[in-house]
Curated annotation (Swiss-Prot):
InterPro entries referenced in this protein's UniProt entry, alphabetically: ATPase_NBD (IPR043129), Heat_shock_70_CS (IPR018181), HSP70_C_sf (IPR029048), HSP70_peptide-bd_sf (IPR029047), Hsp_70_fam (IPR013126), HSPA4L_NBD (IPR042708)
GO biological process, one term: protein folding
GO cellular component: cytoplasm; cytosol; nucleus
Location(s), subcellular: Cytoplasm; Nucleus
Keyword NADP attached: no
Gene label: HSPA4L
Full protein name: Heat shock 70 kDa protein 4L
Ranges of compositional bias, category Basic and acidic residues: 503-554, 791-804, 818-839
Species per Swiss-Prot/TrEMBL record: Homo sapiens (Human)
Length: 839
């Protein structure tokens, strides 16, 4: 089983894998560990990653990038409309109201949902992982910003399904960084001591996130998280772009923002300039050739000017830092370390703002680009049964408070209950008790919409079905379990009705459960419930999430253990209690329908197949082109001596015609046409290539055969001279060897003489394969005869053996015992003999 962590960034993506040696960030086909989050669609195929990034300027309208913020949002969303102004490609309203991308693919205009676009990118990352690991990849952990809402998280989960990935967890980026930091620390305080508090600051290309985390040995607990979803490296790029646009408008009388291609080039140059200014404080030039209207533009900028230009952006660094400390109830002196990650944290002014707030040096021990991917890979390894990882528990939190609303029995009345407050531990489950006589609907929404970077407070509605009054006409007791799962997504996990079944006999005197007794019991069990919750935080798996029970009034009631005891008491007093599961109908905000998701998965499969077929077609075409260029080059060099002038002229014409055909009629042909064309060319080229190869390899083959003949002749000569090494050989067989050698020499001389009379342009008389076969034939016939080993001299039998003839088995003895003794004597003799040899 593969263990993969994916950092799905706004600008770039990183992939980390867990191997026996640890966590490793893998490289793509360009030997680059960074894969741009970019997809370019063409008339026949798609380019994804590095190949797509190179087409941003050349294929402006059909190259998709910067789409991460469009997840889970409607087309009319203010954020989508803001992004629409920035993006050079066209956005379109999809049939379900969500934002989509309109591009030209396979010679027609096509809309793609954001889930499809991200699915394409994830499929590419999956392919890169499989190429590196040499095995299929399915399970993974994908990073998302901590401020993503339920709709955005579900959208990313759908994109993973489109790519054929099984996402074990959607992990908050800052939590992934904290895991990558903490799991390797050997000096963390024990569980019974005060935890070590660490601040993690992540400023990427599009967002700014801050997290405070408490570490103990084997434990990570997120205390608070804050963010600015609209502050990142691209905002600093935009400040530079706006500055230079104004300057060029005055200096060169050109409006850069009217030309999307020129604007993209300026963005690229400003990003480079920003990175250079992080390392240099002096004036740095900006030069772009043939920028617009065949104009070359130039300017300059230094770090001081840049910081002054971005003063309003730098002022936004401190508020999230202040807010996270307030939410965590910590002072500056409580913080042990400040860790920074993300590309934009390399800007000196950003570092200065952070240092100024905390009044201590910041730490850069983590890899600013790869820390998120590494944390995701570690989480995947923890969740995977295939890897044994050091025990390490992770407790994340709910970034926004969540409230449930339902209709009450009063006319036009409704009830509300805040089930999860802000910064509540997650994953977590709670049980809420309702008293209902009919099916009812629960509406989940974010309590404080002004805190959520999303225009719609609704999460979804959940209808609890099959609720009926009890047999005695009373309201049914319905227990509803709500959960924030391992992905940070809210759901109504289950619902059940408690049905009373009276025992035989009169139980009218049995005590009833009243509001008073309920409240008194609540006081007795509150402390115990809180302890159970804290213990439950140690596990990050959804199936191990802690639970808490709430009455429909919103007041906390009994813990699970206490409630079970009460049920037992009520059963003894009043009768049997039966729990029946109820069906739940969910209607989630911006949820993709299963049919639509299946169509996206099917379309992705078709596009992958189209890419594969196009690659094979291009490979076949390139093979023809490569053969033409390579053979033409060889005709002027190594093949020149092996072709007549007439044939050279004809073949050169064929090669030239093929080259012209490739760029004219053969520009766009099916794969089989190119395969046939290559075979046709090889009919001309292979005879020449064969002559060249025969000429190159023939001398070595002839030399090897000559050496073998000489070697056998030396043995024959030694045999004739009565050499004692060969005096055991059979004379008849040696005569056969002499005849074989004589025939081989005659064959060799005749073939060499005939070959020497031919020119290099003629077909050879004898092929290398024939010479090699003759050499093997000689070996097979002569070697068994001339290398026949001498027979060993007979060794005289030992005299004690004669005496042993009288040592047969006596009466009452078996032959087996005698044999055993004989074996023992033999072994002793052998040992003795061995000792003598040593001496």
């Amino acid at each position: 089983m593969s263990v993969v962590g994916i950092d799905l960034g706004f600008l770039n993506c990183y992939i980390a894998v867990a191997r026996s040696g640890g966590i490793e960030t893998i490289a793509n086909e360009y030997s680059d560990r960074c894969t741009p989050a970019c997809i370019s669609l063409g008339s026949r195929t798609r380019a994804i990653g590095n190949a797509a990034k190179s087409q941003i300027v050349t294929n402006v309208r059909n190259t998709i990038h910067g789409f991460k913020k469009l997840h889970g949002r409607s087309f009319d969303d203010p954020i989508v409309q803001t992004e629409r102004i920035r993006l050079p490609y066209e956005l379109q309203k999809m049939p379900n109201g969500s934002a989509g991308v309109k591009v030209r693919y396979l010679e027609e205009e096509r809309p793609f949902a954001i889930e499809q676009v991200t699915g394409m990118l994830l499929a590419k990352l999956k392919e890169t992982s499989e190429n590196a690991l040499k095995k299929p990849v399915a399970d993974c952990v994908i990073s998302i910003p901590s401020f993503f809402t339920d709709a955005e998280r579900r959208s990313v989960m759908a994109a993973a399904q489109v790519a054929g990935l099984n996402c074990l967890r959607l992990m908050n980026e800052t939590t992934a960084v904290a895991l990558a930091y903490g799991i390797y620390k050997q000096d963390l305080p024990p569980l019974d001591e005060k935890p070590r508090n660490v601040v993690f600051i992540d400023m990427g290309h599009s967002a700014y996130q801050v997290l405070v985390c408490a570490f103990n040995k084997g434990k990570l607990k997120v205390l608070a998280t804050t963010f600015d979803p609209y502050l990142g490296g691209r905002n600093f790029d935009e400040a530079l772009v706006d500055y230079f646009c104004d300057e060029f408008k005055t200096k060169y009388k050109i409006n850069v923002k009217e030309n999307s291609r020129a604007l993209l080039r300026l963005y690229q140059e400003c990003e480079k300039l920003k990175k250079l200014m992080s390392a240099n404080a002096s004036d740095l030039p900006l030069n772009i050739e043939c920028f617009m209207n065949d104009l070359d533009v130039s300017s300059k900028m230094n770090r001081a000017q840049f910081e002054q230009l971005c003063a309003s952006l730098l002022a936004r660094v401190e508020p999230p830092l202040k807010a996270v400390m307030e939410q965590a109830n910590l002072q500056r002196e409580d913080i042990s370390s400040i860790e920074i990650v993300g590309g934009a944290t390399r800007i000196p002014a950003v570092k200065e703002q952070i240092t100024k707030f905390f009044l201590k040096d910041i730490s850069t021990t983590l890899n600013a680009d790869e820390a998120v991917a590494r944390g995701c890979a570690l989480q995947c390894a923890i969740l995977s049964p295939a890897f044994k990882v050091r025990e390490f528990s992770i407790t994340d939190l709910v970034p926004y408070s969540i409230t449930l609303r339902w209709k009450t029995s009063f006319e036009d009345g409704s009830g509300e209950c805040e089930v999860f407050c802000k910064n509540h531990p997650a994953p977590f489950s709670k049980v809420i008790t309702f008293h209902k006589k009919e099916p009812f609907e629960l509406e989940a929404f974010y309590t404080n919409l002004h805190e959520v970077p999303y225009p719609d407070a609704r999460i979804g509605s959940f209808t609890i079905q099959n609720v009926f009054p009890q047999s005695d006409g009373d309201s049914s007791k319905v227990k509803v379990k709500v959960r924030v799962n391992i992905h940070g997504i809210f759901s109504v996990a289950s619902a059940s009705v408690i049905e009373k079944q009276n025992l035989e006999g009169d139980h009218s005197d049995a005590p009833m459960e009243t509001e008073t007794s309920f409240k008194n019991e609540n006081k007795d069990n509150m402390d115990k419930m809180q302890v159970d919750q804290e213990e439950g935080h140690q596990k990050c798996h959804a199936e191990h999430t802690p639970e808490e029970e709430i009455d429909h009034t919103g007041a906390k009631t009994k813990s699970a253990v206490s409630d079970k005891q009460d049920r037992l008491n009520q059963t003894l007093k009043k009768g049997k209690v039966k729990s029946i599961d109820l069906p739940i109908q969910s209607s989630l905000c911006r949820q993709l329908g299963q049919d639509l998701l299946n169509s996206y998965i099917e379309n992705e499969g078709k596009m992958i197949m189209q890419d594969k077929l196009e690659k094979e077609r291009n490979d076949a075409k390139n093979a023809v082109e490569e053969y033409v260029y390579d053979f033409r080059d060889r005709l002027g060099t190594v093949y020149e001596k092996f072709i007549t002038p007439e044939d050279l002229s004809k073949l050169s014409a064929v090669l030239e015609d093929t080259e012209n055909w490739l760029y004219e009629d053969g520009e766009d042909q099916p794969k089989q046409v190119y395969v046939d064309k290559l075979q046709e060319l090889k009919k001309y080229g292979q005879p020449i290539q064969m002559k060249y190869m025969e000429h190159e390899e023939r001398p070595k083959a002839l030399n090897d055969l000559g050496k073998k003949i000489q070697l056998v002749m030396k043995v024959i000569e030694a045999y004739r001279n009565k050499d004692e090494r060969y005096d055991h050989l059979d004379p008849t067989e040696m005569e056969k060897v002499e005849k074989c050698i004589s025939d081989a020499m005659s064959w060799l001389n005749s073939k060499m003489n005939a070959q020497n009379k031919l020119s290099l342009t003629q077909d050879p008389v004898v092929k290398v394969s024939e010479i090699v076969a003759k050499s093997k034939e000689l070996d097979n016939f002569c070697n068994p005869i001339i290398y026949k080993p001498k027979p060993k001299a007979e060794v005289p039998e030992d005299k004690p053996k004669a005496n042993s003839e009288h040592n047969g088995p006596m009466d009452g003895q078996s032959g087996t015992e005698t044999k055993s003794d004989s074996t023992k004597d033999s072994s002793q003799h052998t040992k003795s003999s061995g000792e003598m040899e040593v001496d």
